[in-house]
Amino acid sequence: MCMMGSVFSRKGMLCVLAVWCAASAAYPLRLRYKFRKGDTHRINSLIREDVFVNDTLAHTAEITNRITVHVSEVRVAHGSAPDAARYVCHFMTSEKSPNNTFRWGRHYESIFWRDAFGVYDIDRSFFMPVVRNVPVFPDYDIEVGDTWEHEAEEAHDLRDGFGIQTPFIVPFTVSYTYRGEVQRGSRRYHHITAAYSMSYESPKRTHGVQRNAKEGMYPVRTTGVSKQNLYWDNELGNIAEYDDEFRILLYLSGGTVLRYQGTATAKNFAPERFDPARTVVELQETLKDLHMPDAKVRETEEGVTISIENVQFDADSASLAPSEYEKLRKIAELLRAFPDRELLVSGHAARRGSVQDQQRISEERADVVARYLQELGVVDAAHVYTRGCGAQQSIAPNDSEDGRRKNRRVEITIISK
């Protein structure tokens, strides 16, 4: 991933800050975060971003963020302290590849507490979530047109771009306005706007730490604006979706100015219960009925994986033989039974050529299969990810054509979390 395309690709992380809230059904309206131990959610966002270096367009990126959230503990209000919950979150960020698919990207874990008003208690070592204390609700009932403010912050991961090994924290004040109820598709939501401006001078005491990472490449000033629409589902007690327009300028010590601007959208999902062990048994029976001996099913760390062995790719290429599309059409019909699940397509190569060639071919093979599943309408581009494994996970010896043919395979994982 390009450094400049990844530094501030962060808006999809906002959604994890804006969920699990409760509101009364009548006006005036009281907004509070609501917690229940064992709750799980998945948040998907899509960011379209342009990156400028000294006002010259340098990079355009389309980035997806996948966030899984688990409420592991709930703390009941006591004294002046409100209710709070402990969240265990896993984040994955991915930039769209030149082959028009999203690579299975960088992973983060974060554990934090958040109280009923939305205020965070999070260790400074965690890079995610990026936007923290948004939204925070007032301690009084609100009506249409009411406004309030609260302090918040962004925590950016600048390890790749600048060698800064701790989160880069930028504080700001958010202004909120309650706009009333709106219709979004078949649902009615409470509409809240949130806006903030940033103007932050990096403390001089941090310059030395940053300079030691990469000489001449550290931020001394950060400015920017963000305008967000938050859509509150009062029945479920969640922020159901949001959109955002943002612009951030990063002034570097050497005089270079980086500008990141774009839009983001995100939705919150509560997937239906998924039993991996049972799914494996059911898919094995179905594959047997379809007479597909080259397809195997197993439970993996990421979910349920269908391994399609002996896929007929042309040697040293990602081109599928015409007969192989029929195999994929059969697999696609199986996958239609899981419309709320995301997919991970992994490509594998035989051990021929250089390691770099093996990696490239495996990525391209995964891309071919992922795009075909999109063409068949099984999944959209934002909910299927690809991964190239090179020749690192061979299932047969590579010293014969038969073994190499088995290793030229594709695996499709139904992601369980």
UniProtKB/Swiss-Prot annotation:
Molecular-function GO terms, alphabetical: porin activity
GO annotation (BP), single: monoatomic ion transport
Domain OmpA-like, chain residue ranges per copy: 300-417
Pfam families for this protein: OmpA (PF00691)
InterPro entries assigned to the protein according to its UniProt record, in alphabetical order: Bact_OuterMem_StrucFunc, OMP_bac, OmpA-like, OMPA-like_CS, OmpA-like_sf
Signal peptide: 1-26
Bilayer disposition of the protein: Multi-pass membrane protein
GO cellular component: cell outer membrane; pore complex
Superkingdom per UniProt: Bacteria
SUPFAM superfamilies: OmpA-like
Localization (cell): Cell outer membrane
Keyword terms: Cell outer membrane, Ion transport, Membrane, Porin, Signal, Transmembrane, Transmembrane beta strand, Transport
Function, in words: Could function as a porin.
Homology family: Belongs to the outer membrane OOP (TC 1.B.6) superfamily.
PANTHER family: LIPOPROTEIN YIAD-RELATED, STATOR ELEMENT OF FLAGELLAR MOTOR COMPLEX
Protein name: Outer membrane protein Tpn50
